[in-house]
Every structure is written in C-alpha cells, then in structure tokens.
Amino acid sequence: MKNITNYYVEDKSKLISNKDAYIVGKKFRITVLSHRLVRIEYSEKGLFEDRPTSLIINRSFPKIDYFITESDSMIEINTGVFTLTYVKDSPIKSGILSSNIKAVINGTKKEWQINNPEVRNLRGINYSIDSVKDKIVLDKGLYSLDGFCLLDDSRSLVLDENDMFIERDKDIKDLYLFMYDNDFEGCLSDYFTLTGYPSMIPRYALGAWWYKNNNYKEEEIKELVDRFNHDNIPISIFLLGDYWHDQNNGYTPSINLKNISNYLNSNNIKLGVTINPKYEIKEGSNDYQLISNYIKANKFSFIPFSNDKIGLYFNLFINNLESMGVNIFSIDYNNPLDRINLWKLDHYHYGKKVISNQRGLILTRNSGIAPHRYPIIWSGKTLVNWTTLNLLPRYNLQGYNIGVSYIAHPIGGYKGGIEEDELYLRYMQFACFSPIFLLASEGGKYYKREPWKWSPTIEKNIEYYMNLRYKLIPYLYSESYNYHITGHGIVKPFYYDYPKIIDEPTYKNQYFFGRDFFVAPITEKKNTIINRVMKKVFIPNGIWFDFLQGKKFIGDKSYNNFYRDEDYPVFVKAGAIIPQNTNIKEEIPTTLEVLVYPLSDGEYSLYEDDGFSNNYKNGLYMITKFNYHYEEDNYTFKISKENGRNLVSTRSYLIRFKNIKNITEVTINDKNIKYNYYYDKDDFIVEVKNLLIGRNLEINIKGKDSLVSSVSLVNEEIKEILYDINITTKLKEQIDKVLFSDIDVRKKRIAIRKLKRKGLDSKYIKIFINLLEYIQKI
C-alpha cells in the first residue's frame, strides 16, 4: 500500500521521459514532451531532476517526432507547432528579458523569451476572495491570448528517496514551456498528463452542504435536520465550524461527535469539521497530554507542517476524529504568505483517504500547487452583497484556466452586508448550476441561510431549486467522471468558443455547464417597474431551449430576455439528453427521468458507481448509453448498456420528449416490454417499467406538426408582464392591441411611442420597445 506521502505517484517509471525526448548539454537538459510542451532545465553543476515534485508526477509522454538543428553554440528544436532556440549552456536567470532562449509559434509572430511578462495571460484563481469588495488580484493561469505560458517548477518541493519532501537547490532552473497557440484543450491535456488528472469526488459532494458557524448543541443539529426533512429540502453534508471544540484545546470535541454522526448518517448526511492546525496546543490541555509523550515543550504547533509531525497529527488526532464519524475536513489555514504548509495539509489529508480506498475530499483555500488534485477549493469568507455575487461566476471560469472545476462559494455570502430576499434567491439559483452547492455564513440568527426564514414565496423557490439540484445529480456525476477522465471542465467560459466577446462585460459571466447546458447567471437586481430582471444574453451557435420555460432560441445572436424571481437563464441545446433522479434519496436510481430535446440528433453516456470508493478503477461501475435520432415528425430513442457491471438489476424510465405534441404512433422494439404514454403540458411522456439492465430498448415516435411553437409561450409571457405592470387597464388594452397585431415591427414601435400622448411614461415605452425586439428575435 502506498504511504500517505507518495500515494500520488502511481508509477515511478513514468517520472522518466523516453530517451529520444532528451537533448543534454553540460549545464542544460531540454526534454521535448509533446508538440506543445517542452521542459527546460539549467544547472551550473549539470545535475538534473528525475524525482517527483509537489507539482509534477509524470514526465512520460508518448514519443513524438521533432527536428533538431545544431551548431557548436546554438541549438534549434522544431516540434511542428513551435520552434525553440537556445544558446548552449548559457545561464537561464530570473529578471530581465533575454534572447538566449526563445520560442516562436510556427506560422505566427507569437514569440516567447525567458522572463516574458505574459501580459495577455487571462489569469487563474488566487488564494481566496475572503472579504474582497471589488477587484481581485488573480494568480497566473495557463490560458493566454498569446498562445503560450511558462510554468516554473524550480522552487517546488522534491520527494526524496526516503519519501520526504525537501527543498531544491536554489541554483537550478526547471521550467515547463507550453506553446499551444489556439489549442488550449491540448494545453490542458498536457498539463494534466504532467501533474495528474482531476480527482474523482464522492457523489454526495454534489449535493447541498450546510455550514453555518454556530455554536450548535447536539439537539439543535437534530432540530435543524428535522426541519430540512419536514420541508422536503435535501442536504448531504453538515459541516461544523469553530465551535465543535475548545479552540485552545485544538482537537478534543466539546460535543458528542459520535452521536451527531450517527444521527446524520441515519439521514444520509455526512459530517465534516473545520480544523486549523495553526492553533497552539498548550500545556494543561487534553491534547497536550497526548503530545507530551512524544515532544517536550510548554506549547506546540503543527505549523510549520514538517515530515516528522505527520505521524503525530494523524495518529493522535485525525484518526480519532474519523473514528467518531467525521468524513470531511475543512482546512481553515488562512495564510496567503504560506502556501507550502497549506499544500502539505491538503496533500496529506487527501492522501489519507486515498490509501484507504476512499475518494479524497477536503475543503481548502487554493495552495496554487495542482489544486485540481485536491478538491474542493473554498473561495473564503466572502461578503454578503451583489458585488460578490457578480464576482463568483467569473471566479469559477478563472478556475478553468488552471484546470479547476470544483470551487465552493458561501452561497448567500459569508459575512456582513444586508440579508435581501432577492439576493439570496439569485445566489441559490446560481448554486444550482454550479459544481458545488455550499450554504454557508458566519454564526448568528440574523444570517438567514435557513430557507424557512424567508417569505413563503422565496422559500418555495429555494425548495424548487434545491430539489432541482438533486434531480440533476445523475447528469452532474457523469460530467464529473468525464472531467476526471478527460480533463474537460464542468464549467467552461463562454469566451473559449466566442473569443470575440472576451472583453464584452455584458457576457463575461456566461458559461457552459457540462456538455449540454449553457448558463447566463443573474447577478443584478430586477427592474421594479416590471418586477423582472431585464437581461441581455448571447446564445451560442445552434438551437437552444430555455430549460425552465421551453422557449426555443436560434443561436449566434443576443436577446433581451425578461426573468421573474422564479426564472433563471439556463438553456439546453437541441438534441440534448438529460438524465434526472425521480427519487433524490437514491444513490443509484431505480427510476430515471430522461429529458430529450428535439431538432437535432443526440447521445449521452450516464456514468454510475458506488459513489464513494475507488473500486470504479477496478471495473465496478456502469455506463448506460442513450441515443436520439431526430427527423421531422419522426423520433427514435435508444437505451443500451455500454460498459461496466450491473449495479441494479432493473430500472424504470420516464422518457420526456420535450416540446412535442400531435403524436400519432408509438412503437417499441420488444413486445414483452411494458410501456405507457401520455402528454404532460407541452411534453410527450413514454414510461417503461422494470427494464432489465443490459436489455436494449428502442422507441420510435411519429407525429404531424409535432413541435410545440415558441410563439404561444412568448405570448403568454408578454401577457404576464402586462398583468404585472403598474399602468391603467385602458393603456394595457391599447398596448396589447399593438403587440399582438399583424403590423410589422417598425410600425409597432411607432404605435407604442405614440401612446406617450395618452399618458404612457417614457420608462414604460422603453420596456415595450425592448419587448418588441425580444418578440422579433424569438
């Protein structure tokens, strides 16, 4: 079994590149790893590094062809993608630009030199956004508009032959140069090959987390969970903050964690606690009595977190907490100037789970060292306000630039500010379509993270979105597996596919959510005149459907949309297949609802396993394949088992064909399969009961003029806006007559403006002009 230090190095032979990749001089070694990636080492002593570092765990890339041109003093390497030149054995120093080593992307003017400031780098994420009020100073990312990025591994810790992390010689340079031009997906692939692919998180981590920093009594925890259950609002993780122990007595609980864990587990909830190893263990405390058997001092701290303290930390304290039922540790070591010790804490805590055949899971700020290997990144104790909410989507997208998808934000904001119902609801909706859903705040009864503390209308909306989150977990978990295997992030910035809008602030927060969703989060207050948010959204290329309302949008253009409190700008592409839970308490669903969107062919692979162990690596998983073939008024849907073992023996399906009507014929490939079909509003449902796993299903549906028009949906939306707006009924009737007339849009605009003479205020005229634009585009 691997130990807690070196668990992340799966095969030490992969630390060495293939022999044809090396070009070696007296003081330099260049390793051509891929067509986009080269390693550059410089050492005055001619000593080069083959051991793992805190960042790098694999240097064995597939062999590639490249070309070398060499003289006594110069070397030129052409990979086909870029050309690197180097003055042999010349020093590679930090500081000013130098042309002794440089690289050019072939066929372009994009040139890198040592110490290039990389001003067009789009940055990654920083340590945290604790208390940030506006702008964020971000760390460097991999993605640059110049198409190159330098990763400096010179100061990383090295894992020595005794499995100890040690510092490196300060007189060396160890650089990884990515020259990818426009192929950022290829850059990420190389980065993950080098540093390890993203970790697979437990399934329960995709549910809702509860973290309110109250001084809870055992009975208060039970009452809180009972209330969540009573209101049909699910949670999966209960995280205790500062008060589960006396902070002067760091690791001895002041409440009965075993009882709490047993109760939470009976409700399918995991227990987590917050720890901060910087707290000193002082003479006279219970913890000191344990430590004093090994170390003699009147006080003791685990920071700096050294190799010789690891055993004491885990064997005396962490193991004890785990025996009481603690599943998750939130590492609250908040010191941006000491990321090395934070990384060590992350590395060892995560590794302790892995060597026990469990999936690691921690909550931690960003150490900056391969954070994708140590989920989940905690953005910190953020402020409660609209400015913070507006920062969060973009922060998630910055994570994509360094390969990180799992970022947890305190939903609702953590501290300060004003508790506003509209703000809280928009936080919750954003969380529903984020990788991690963490309800968190400082302690105190006036921080209203409990949904029932809000008005009945807001609570109803919160309940809807929290339950929707759980319904989407089959989709989210499959996307998590895809991220783990391929490195394709769960959230992807919109500007990757549309670089022309990268500097357009209106669209900066838009993102893809998995392969089939597109989200344009609401981060501003609504227009009180119409009681709706007026939001401009740029829809991607293709055909998309509003996930909640069903309206169809033609892509590659912008729309001025209108959103009530209960609405949210989430879109699903044509041909998408979205698997959903019907019973949110089931880990492996016995019944699935599958949403199928028209106007394009589609496919989806549903991934499932036990949700917590690493047995999936040994084949204990199941992949179900869904296929959809679309022709006008003729639809074929197939279900087949693609791979893995049977985790359930049978499964029932409720297959919801979206926006379909006027069906004339339904056939299924096997007459022995029992099925039923019916309409539900604008959807057509086919139900199949107890289908044997491994048994293929094929459904064919035929109809006439079967696609539901978006016009009727838009018309109803306009009528609702007219109902809500605060003007005279007579003016409403006149506006209705104009909007729903057969005259062209230009004449409608003129007619609306003329209503000013009859008392229609300019602010309303502007709104209805926007509505006309919306109608025209739809």
Name every feature range the model reports, one short phrase each.
Residues 1-205, 210-213, 218-220, 225-226, ...:
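N-terminal accessory segment at the very beginning of proteins
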Residues 27, 36, 44, 81, ...:
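A broadly conserved detector of short glycine/acidic/proline-rich loop/turn motifs that flank catalytic sites
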Residues 52-65, 546-565, 665-688:
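Solvent-exposed beta-strand/loop surfaces of large extracellular or lumenal domains
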